[in-house]
Amino acid sequence: VDTLTAPRPANGADRRRWWARPQRWAMALALATGALHGPNAHAGSQKEEALADSVRLALSNAILDARPPKPTFRNPADQQRYQVWLAQMSARLQRRLPDQQVRTEFLETAWYEAHRAGLDPGLVLGLIQVESAYRKYAVSMVGARGYMQVMPFWTNVIGDRNRSALFNMQTNLRYGCAILRMYLDMEAGNLYLALGRYNGSRGRPEYPNAVLSAWQNWKFKSPL
């Protein structure tokens, strides 16, 4: 398959603080677990992996920063593009999330958490489409929860052990984006493999292809 490379987090104090030197701690994770190169798991059956202390700390810092999703912009043009993005995505999402207030809050949070982790917001929206069909309280057969179908064990590994918080919009999106960013760094930017790892089906085409296809529904067409 072709190698798909996702963007790195942009420069800025906020991103430097919680995601410092991702390649270094991603390598530490690869060395810390023997499961990385083992047999492919079935979809939805991903296993908890041992994390190096540096990886655990980086992810914990990413999750526990409780500031609200209030974006800042370099200039008025960037802010205008953001507003256009919100309008476009809101129109596309209306059928799935008919309540305007809920839809706006969801999109603002998804945009913020995606950018915070250096991800394309459209990719995150496509992943959510595949994972939960935008159902806040979705629970999979293996117990994954919420919009981004986060496995509860992550709350023990990098959170505060509050599994019910995975049904909180911002908490769920923050976990999901941080975990996907970690997998991207583990896979040296290979989005295809990172998506497979997110789903517990690394190396199998069904899930990555589904997300990449859904991503097309959320591509931003900037008029600026």
Sequence positions of predicted segments:
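N-terminal secretory targeting signals
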Residues: 1-90, 96-97, 220-224
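Catalytic glycan-binding domains that act on GlcNAc-containing polysaccharides
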Residues: 67-224
